[in-house]
């Protein structure tokens, strides 16, 4: 995969830094895949005052706190982040090229 503004070729680019994207990026890095998360910063999880269906939080957790902790964990494995909105994904020469 190619991130045009950086010219980087990566195993995976995760579009979206919500709980699913952060979980994916953590596992990808744990399995030694090169990975970046591109996130516009509009995760719906931020709106959740208290989520009671997240493993490890039996008393619930605020969405913002959950995102902060998940991002810290992803960063601890070397996940890179870019605060951008992905506008287009195209396949070119056997690769995916993202425009942000």
Question: What are these model-predicted stretches?
Answer:
Residues 14, 96-97:
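Low-complexity, compositionally biased segments
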Residues 50, 77, 94-96:
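A generic structural signal for short beta-strands and their flanking turns/coil linkers
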Residues 82-96:
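A conserved short coil-to-beta-strand element within the FAD-binding core of flavoproteins
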């Amino acid at each position: 995969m190619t991130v045009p503004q950086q010219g980087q070729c990566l195993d995976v680019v995760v579009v979206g830094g919500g709980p699913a994207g952060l979980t994916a990026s953590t596992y990808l890095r744990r399995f030694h895949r090169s990975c970046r998360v591109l996130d516009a910063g509009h995760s719906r999880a931020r709106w959740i005052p208290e989520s009671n269906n997240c493993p490890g939080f039996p008393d619930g957790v605020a969405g913002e706190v959950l995102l902060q902790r998940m991002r810290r964990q992803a960063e601890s494995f070397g996940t890179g982040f870019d605060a951008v909105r992905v506008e287009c994904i195209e396949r070119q020469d056997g690769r995916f090229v993202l425009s942000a």
